[in-house]
């Protein structure tokens, strides 16, 4: 049902975010939720005064609803489910037979990078615990590759591992021994380990600079092709910063060419990837139908239509099959965020944006009467979806999450309004002033708060109380990486169309620096924020393990989406290839 028909609050089906009338009256829940509101018809005939509006001339979507509805792989059938179970038994046997800690660590690393580590969580944790307990007795035998892999895999799993384990590879002056640079595999492993650095760990800072220098040397030498590919891949972006699902697709192809490939593990990785992709396609078809029927794309033609790209962000944040509802919510949220962001950045007048922000903050239907028609549609879109999600959540879990979701929306809109005010007054903030607002305007907190509620945290009352008090820092850190990676690739185009100065321009203005120096400063800032976020790898927050993973993955997804340019605003190029490999094309099985 399109948005120009009657809407009731809340709509009843979370799975579709449709505009249907709920079966039960909900006036006892939120008074405004049960009112019947007629959405205005947007048309070329309008009584509103004509305003000179900017246009970003966004490219239309390259992913039509008809195309998305055609995505339907056959990897969900019982024959594949049965084959997966047989392959899992074989891989479990390989885990049991892995001879010695190095072989065990290498197999665990393969499992995780191939994307099937989640199928063997118990076995992996037991094996890592055993290796950790035996560390003191065996560490004298370890080479650089083994030591680095031990550090990376265990720290990533929350074990308390000190970088002091690398001290025996350093000379009496405190520098890394030059002799270890002759080992490209060891260099690669140490390089990857260094990116799990926390603030103050200077040994790992030095390791990163040392290995980067020598890996660039090895990249040009005659080494085994798979090692050369891994070096090139790592220098582009380390494992710890990569979007896991996308990296798994890359690593499956590499693993096929590596020496010592386990054929049954390779088959498991390919089949599991295709089966999960099939589940993703089912969700994507559902979300695309919702967006097509919702009608907002036609009415808000000033905004980016990026449903497929939004679903990429959802996969990047939580890809596991059991989080399908969360991905649907996040994909819909991402598309609504795109509309609201473009309304503030491009289309809305200063006075209109003040009224809209006030309406979202009040969360009251009566406040929309003074809004122009297009803004009424935008307000009702976020109001409808939020109240609907809250209704379903209350029904399923007995907890009212609407106050948290509406506050997240209000905070987001207030941050966008602040930027609009800066543009209108031609004000350039300091970098700190910009970042204090921009981590919210990037939408990271809004996305992560939805991810928390819809990724299955329980018991809810205790989880919410703990979440509100203990997760503000990791949300801010993840959202800051999101903001800064975006700025590095989109700032020039956005400023050209009249957007607020971004982090690069703020630092240029504040420090009197060149653009090249400012870009280097922002890259350094990103590394600094990653170090701070890495503290959460070992933080005692096991009850929020899923949420912490989502926070890390949001930062990783932004890093990958903006690695080759504006992978969200410009719907082609390298990111089109990434989306195709994630959601369109299955891996060929031999």
UniProtKB/Swiss-Prot annotation:
Entry's Gene Ontology molecular function annotations: magnesium ion binding; terpene synthase activity
Pathway: Secondary metabolite biosynthesis; terpenoid biosynthesis
Keywords attached to this entry: Chloroplast, Lyase, Magnesium, Metal-binding, Plastid, Transit peptide
EC number from the UniProt entry: 4.2.3.115, 4.2.3.-, 4.2.3.177
Cofactor: Mg(2+)
Cofactor-binding details, from the entry: Binds 3 Mg(2+) ions per subunit.
UniProt-annotated binding residues for (2E)-geranyl diphosphate: 304, 341, 345, 483, 486
UniProt-annotated location(s): Plastid, Chloroplast
Principal location class: plastid
Parts of the chain that traverse the membrane: none
CDD domains: Terpene_cyclase_plant_C1
Residues annotated to bind Mg(2+) 1: 341, 345
GO biological-process terms attached to the record: diterpenoid biosynthetic process
A single GO cellular-component term on record: chloroplast
Superkingdom, natural source: Eukaryota
First and last residues of the transit peptide: 1-42
Residues engaged in binding Mg(2+) 2: 341, 345
Chemical reaction(s) catalysed: (2E)-geranyl diphosphate = beta-thujene + diphosphate; (2E)-geranyl diphosphate = sabinene + diphosphate; (2E)-geranyl diphosphate = beta-pinene + diphosphate; (2E)-geranyl diphosphate = alpha-terpinene + diphosphate
Motif mapping: DDXXD motif: 341-345
SUPFAM superfamilies membership: Terpenoid cyclases/Protein prenyltransferases (SSF48239), Terpenoid synthases (SSF48576)
Subunit composition and interactions: Monomer.
Entry function: Monoterpene synthase involved in the biosynthesis of volatile organic compounds. Mediates the conversion of (2E)-geranyl diphosphate (GPP) into beta-thujene, sabinene, beta-pinene and alpha-terpinene. Does not use (2E,6E)-farnesyl diphosphate (FPP) as substrate.
Family: Belongs to the terpene synthase family. Tpsb subfamily.
Notes concerning its domains: The Asp-Asp-Xaa-Xaa-Asp/Glu (DDXXD/E) motif is important for the catalytic activity, presumably through binding to Mg(2+).
Protein known as: Monoterepene synthase TPS1, chloropastic
Organism: Cananga odorata
UniProt gene name: TPS1
């Amino acid at each position: 049902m399109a948005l120009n028909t009657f809407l009731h609050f809340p709509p009843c089906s979370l799975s579709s975010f449709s505009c249907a009338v709920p079966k039960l009256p909900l006036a006892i829940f939120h008074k405004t939720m049960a009112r019947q509101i007629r959405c205005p018809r947007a048309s070329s005939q309008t009584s509103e005064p004509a305003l000179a509006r900017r246009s970003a001339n966004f490219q239309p979507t390259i992913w039509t609803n008809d195309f998305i509805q055609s995505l339907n792989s056959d990897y969900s059938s019982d024959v594949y489910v049965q084959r997966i179970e047989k392959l899992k038994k074989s891989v479990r046997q390989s885990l049991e037979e892995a001879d010695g800690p190095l072989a065990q660590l290498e197999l665990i690393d393969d499992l995780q990078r191939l994307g099937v580590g989640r199928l063997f969580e118990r076995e992996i944790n037991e094996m890592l615990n055993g290796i950790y307990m035996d560390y003191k007795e065996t560490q004298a035998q370890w080479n650089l590759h083994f030591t680095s892999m031990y550090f990376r895999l265990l720290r990533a799993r929350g074990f308390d591992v000190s970088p002091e384990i690398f001290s025996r590879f350093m000379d009496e002056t405190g520098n890394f021994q030059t002799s270890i640079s002759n080992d490209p595999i060891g260099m690669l492993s140490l390089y990857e380990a260094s990116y799990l650095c926390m603030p103050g760990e200077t040994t790992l800072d030095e390791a990163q600079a040392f290995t980067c220098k020598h890996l660039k040397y090895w990249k040009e030498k005659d080494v085994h092709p798979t090692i050369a590919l891994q070096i090139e891949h790592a220098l582009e972006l380390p494992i710890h910063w990569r979007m896991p699902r996308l990296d798994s697709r890359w690593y499956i192809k590499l693993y096929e060419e590596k020496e010592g490939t386990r054929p049954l593990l390779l088959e498991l990785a390919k089949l599991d990837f295709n089966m999960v992709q099939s589940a993703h396609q089912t969700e994507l078809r559902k979300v695309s139908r919702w967006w097509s029927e919702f009608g907002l794309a036609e009415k808000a033609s000033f905004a980016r239509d990026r449903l497929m790209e939004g679903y990429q962000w959802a996969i990047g944040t939580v890809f596991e099959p059991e989080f399908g509802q969360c991905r649907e919510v996040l994909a819909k949220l991402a598309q609504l965020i795109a509309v609201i962001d473009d309304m503030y950045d491009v289309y809305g007048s200063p006075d209109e944006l003040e009224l809209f922000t006030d309406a979202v903050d009040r969360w009251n239907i009566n406040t929309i009467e003074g809004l122009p028609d297009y803004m009424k549609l935008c307000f009702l879109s976020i109001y409808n979806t939020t109240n609907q999600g809250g209704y379903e959540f209350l029904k399923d879990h007995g907890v009212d999450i609407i106050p948290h979701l509406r506050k997240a929306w209000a905070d987001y809109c207030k941050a966008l309004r602040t930027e609009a005010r800066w543009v209108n007054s031609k004000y350039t903030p300091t970098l700190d002033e910009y970042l204090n607002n921009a981590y919210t305007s990037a939408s990271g907190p809004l996305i992560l708060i939805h991810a928390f509620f819809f990724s299955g945290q329980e018991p809810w009352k205790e989880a919410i109380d703990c979440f509100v008090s203990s997760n503000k820092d990791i949300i801010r850190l993840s959202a800051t990486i999101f903001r800064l990676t975006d700025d590095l690739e989109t700032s020039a185009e956005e400023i050209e169309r009249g957007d607020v100065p971004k982090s690069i321009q703020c630092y240029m203005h504040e420090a009197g620096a060149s653009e090249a120096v400012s870009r280097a400063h922002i890259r350094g800032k990103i590394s600094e924020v990653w170090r701070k976020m890495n503290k959460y790898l070992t933080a005692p927050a096991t009850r929020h393990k899923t949420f912490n993973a989502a926070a890390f993955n949001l930062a990783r997804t932004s890093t990958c989406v903006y690695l080759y340019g504006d992978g969200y605003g410009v719907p082609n190029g390298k990111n089109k290839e990434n989306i195709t490999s994630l959601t369109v094309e299955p891996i060929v099985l031999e």
